[in-house]
Amino acid sequence: MFLSLLLAGFLTFVELNCENMFDCRHDSLKQDYEWLPEGKRHWTPARYWRKLNNIGQEILSCQEEGVPDLVAVVEVENDSCLFDLTRRSLLRNAGYEYLMTESPDERGIDVALLYQPLTFRPICYDYLDIQPLATMNPTRDILYVEGETLSGDTLHVFIVHAPSRFGGEKHTRANRQLVADRLLAAVQLLPPAAKVIIAGDFNDDATAPALRHLENSGLHNVTATATGSQGAKGTYRYQGFWQSIDHIFVSRSLTGHVKRAFIHDAPFLLEEDKKYGGVKPFRTFNGYRYQRGFSDHLPLVVRFSF
């Protein structure tokens, strides 16, 4: 009874870009050739399983006691990867179920929500498709999940992987604005007091126009100033500079329930940045050089109290 009451009072939400979680089998409908054993990255079964176990270890380490209740993962290829991650990797005893998109992204990457059935019961889910502009390639759908927590609260969760800045930030800005507009249109269909969480890799920092648009529309970026205990000042590091391109937004109705928001930068997720000094995420690949690491992004963690 005491444990149930304790679990009912708190909920841990994690967001993680998994850095190309591909299996090593070819999907004839997708451009996944470099993620095959004979491809440029020599993506063998041994490397695939190391990747899954690394991501499983990373997720488990985000909470000292128990496991995170909800985990938004982006940059995952397909259902096979999620099945192997939740049923056959180091994460197999955690009891996660999952929901994921089937997007038109040309490389085949998608987003997903891992959830603990004990503390989160999905009521319904849907995919929000992004109709691409004339100048952009097909991109990832937004995953929407409505579910009930152990405390009886209903959450509306949106998981995003916005288009990249490849081709230049200004040139691609409209692509990310399109995703923000699609998000807001969906949120505005919900009741005014709905408890909303929006998480993912937005490929923009908190001051970008698309993200300011979300803030100006009543959503609060609870991870805008998040840092880590080991020196991380962002979730991603490029040429010696930390960047926060992963974000977790909540509706006004949830703002008062946020007890803590931080970047999980456990020492084993970091490596020395020999070129620029300091530390950086211990990634799987540096260019095409295999490093046996975890991800080029660090996870965000938000702790809620209900």
Regions found by a protein language model. Name each.
Residues 6-93, 99-111, 181, 195, ...:
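N-terminal, active-site-proximal structural segment of metallo-dependent hydrolase catalytic domains
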Residues 12-15, 69-74, 97-100, 111-115, ...:
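Structural recognition of the beta-strand scaffold that forms the well-ordered cores
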Residues 29, 150, 158-172:
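Active-site His/acidic residue clusters
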Residues 39-46, 67-73, 100-101, 131-133, ...:
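Second-shell loop/turn segments in exported
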Residues 70, 76-162:
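Structured beta-strand-rich core segments of catalytic domains in phosphoester-bond hydrolases
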Residues 78-80, 106-108, 165-167, 203-209, ...:
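Active-site environment of divalent metal-dependent phosphoester hydrolases
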Residues 170-193:
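A long, amphipathic alpha-helix that forms part
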Residues 185-196, 203-306:
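Metal-dependent phosphoester-hydrolase catalytic domains
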